[in-house]
Structures are given as structure tokens and as C-alpha cells.
């Protein structure tokens, strides 16, 4: 059912978010759909605990592949609503819309390097500060504050680099 949901959201994206001169990068093809599956395959099966965990992984990957390309709030909100509808229809799960935006996966929150669901910003902050301290020992020191948006962007960057 997850593949059917991914195909459904892909269909909605290519039909609703058409390229315009201001949004010429809204050009998608089947390779983008395969990136959703590729992102899901980065997660080790030992880490996937249940159906809800798998759906969160699916949500994260569709958001990274499709939603992160959208440049205005109206388009991002429409994508979130479409995703919510697809999740309800295909995967029989009813979540509140704000819960969708806070799902993030990465490989820097555990010692094994598994791609898995990240904790909250408060959970990640000590780990990120340790990684920053290690970096600062070897390079020119950086002084970073790990607020919520920063952690979300770090997760996105780490995902890109992992691929």
C-alpha cells in the first residue's frame, strides 16, 4: 500500500504543481518517485518497529523529495493536505496535519550509523554539540546554536550526503 500511496502523491504533485516561469524547477519525473523508495531503503529493516514507523519513514521521504522543492507556503500547505489525504485513504492512519511536518530521519543520532527516526530537538542537541566539539578540535572553531530549523536542515543535508 505504501507504493500505491507514493504513486498517488506523485500523481497529485505532477498535476497540481506545474512549472511556471517563477517555478521552473517544479519539473518532476519518475526518477523522483524512485528517490522516495531509495530513501526508504536507506533504513535498515531491524530499525523498523511497526506500521506507524514505516509510515513515518514514507512521510519523511515524500516530504524530502517533493515538498522541499516547493517555494511558497501555499504550495507547501497544499502538499501537506494532499499527503494527509493519501495517508488516510491508502494507509488507514489519521494523524493531525502538524504531526507530518515534524518527522525527520537521519543517521547522526546513533552510534551504529543507522538511518532512523530522529528524536526531538532537545534529545538531539547534546549529540550535535558533541559532534560540533569534535569538529572544532580538528578545524577552525564554529559556534553554532542548534534550534529546531537548524536541526531539520542538518537532517536534510545529512540525508543528501548519505545518498
Tell where the protein language model's regions lie, with residue ranges:
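Alpha-helical lid/collar subdomain of P-loop NTPases
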Residues: 1-162
